[in-house]
């Protein structure tokens, strides 16, 4: 039961950190982000590139998709441009997963300290936006570390080991991935949980790929 509470707490920190960082980035960019997107999506390749970069920035392919739909409805973008950006958004999500896989959680407290310091001492809105970015990044990786620590006891559970062995079935792994992402409404959050399990050797590489 303790590991479940730890997982929930870590996931909560991860989601909050991701949201805080995304909000800070959007505030820092302001309307410039929308103008840049509109200007750079004149061809499919640039659309894919923009979709990838924007998703990496705001940490949410769903938010990128919603933004694109809004642009299309407003007549600022055609369907041809939208398809390229949405395709790029899915690529951006995988890059986010690669960032999460890097073992930089030990630097999370430093990022949190710097973020809080900037937020408290900063007078300008732009400085506070930068503070939210740094603080959000720190909280995000702190949440990742918390999930990994919470999952460590599961590695000694025979029942859980047998359950994970079944995930070598590609269709079952795919189903688990779909259900997790649907519930969490964030593929990055789903990846974070899976990577936390993998960091404790609770889930093998084959199962991780399927999910």
Go through the PLM ranges and name each one:
Residues 209-211:
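Conserved small/polar residues in nucleotide/adenosyl-binding loops
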Residues 55-64, 77, 83-99, 104-109, ...:
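Membrane-embedded alpha-helical segments of transport systems
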Residues 47-51, 89-97, 112-118, 176-177, ...:
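Hydrophobic, membrane-inserted alpha-helices
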Residues 1-44, 134-179, 197-201:
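Helix-loop-helix hairpins and the membrane-proximal interhelical loops
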Residues 63-73, 112-116, 189-199:
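Re-entrant/interfacial helical elements at transmembrane boundaries that shape
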Residues 18-27, 68-73, 114-128:
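C-terminal ends of transmembrane helices
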Residues 43-47, 64-76, 91-101, 168-175, ...:
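Short juxtamembrane and helix-loop transition motifs at transmembrane-helix boundaries
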Residues 40-67, 170-193:
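Hydrophobic alpha-helical transmembrane segments of multi-pass integral membrane proteins
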């Amino acid at each position: 039961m303790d590991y479940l509470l730890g997982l929930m707490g870590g996931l909560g920190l991860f989601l909050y950190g991701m949201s805080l960082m995304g909000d800070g980035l959007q505030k820092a960019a302001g309307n410039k982000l929308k103008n840049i997107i509109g200007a750079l999506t004149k061809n499919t390749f640039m659309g894919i590139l923009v979709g990838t970069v924007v998703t990496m920035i705001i940490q949410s392919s769903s938010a990128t998709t919603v933004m694109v739909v809004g642009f299309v409805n407003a007549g600022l973008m055609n369907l041809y441009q939208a398809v390229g950006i949405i395709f790029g958004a899915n690529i951006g999500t995988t890059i986010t997963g690669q960032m999460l896989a890097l073992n930089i959680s030990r630097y999370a407290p430093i990022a949190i300290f710097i973020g809080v310091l900037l937020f408290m001492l900063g007078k300008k809105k732009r400085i506070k936006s930068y503070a939210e970015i740094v603080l959000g990044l720190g909280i995000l990786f702190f949440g990742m570390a918390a999930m990994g620590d919470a999952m460590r006891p599961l590695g000694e559970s025979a029942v859980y080991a047998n359950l994970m062995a079944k995930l070598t079935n590609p269709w079952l792994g795919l189903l688990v991935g779909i259900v997790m992402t649907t519930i969490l409404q964030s593929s990055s959050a789903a990846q974070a949980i899976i990577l936390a399990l993998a960091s404790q050797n609770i889930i093998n590489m084959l199962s991780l790929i399927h999910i």
